[in-house]
């Protein structure tokens, strides 16, 4: 294994072999390149037009999908949302779904206009839902992972332990070492594989000139981008699957029932066992099978 102190000098794709092993993929890895479109950065997987678009959650980045994309084996586009990964930060700190959807729509229109499926987790799920309502031609089918418009309210009601890794977004921003950053991450998600979390921190952090480490994502200052999201649901006509983590507190049964009752395109809700909020991190292979089933129709 590569030592922690050597990570800062690595290419962002240097650990993909670990993701492939986790996904059970032994064949040659597909091509993957970083693409920049104005303020938005993304990962383009494969040489053909993307069949699946992936939007990550708050405090994450496009690499959160690496294992899932490798397991799925299809051309894909994974986008860094504004203020995350290698995408630009907003001066107002509003990273809500409304402005996010406006920012990623032209990127999807250019790079993945014919995608069959959009997959969004948490903040990415709300962004995808907003995109489906405002730019329906870009969202032929939707999978929302562990989120409904009530998720911001649920977030306010949770303890630090119930939030899991999401709690890190509200915590310290600078660390003396990569190891210190990894330690707080492991403490927030003790059920997760340490190597998987190590990759996650590698992709979600950067070393500063003074040798300390910090997160790649900006501080959330919210704005009004999370308001009125339930008002969009009656206009959600794209076929939609809701995936829930069985151990998550971000979506309760009442939220799921209300979403299914209100969204015209609602197809099914699937609960993933032994998973918290981040299904792609906790149970990536189970998510791969769900996405394959959705794509088959």
Pin down the residues of each PLM region.
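Alpha/beta-hydrolase fold catalytic core
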Residues: 1-50, 73-74, 113-114, 295-297
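Conserved HGGG/HGGXW glycine-rich cap/lid loop of the alpha/beta-hydrolase fold
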Residues: 38-88
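Gly/Ala-rich beta-loop-alpha elbow adjacent to hydrolase catalytic centers
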Residues: 120, 124, 128
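Active-site loop/oxyanion-hole signature of alpha/beta-hydrolase fold enzymes
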Residues: 67, 77-119, 289
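Conserved serine/cysteine hydrolase catalytic core
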Residues: 207-262, 271
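Conserved alpha/beta-hydrolase catalytic His-Asp/Glu region
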Residues: 173-227, 232
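Catalytic histidine-centered segment of alpha/beta-hydrolase-like enzymes
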Residues: 275-284
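Flexible "cap/lid" loop of the alpha/beta hydrolase fold
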Residues: 133, 140-174
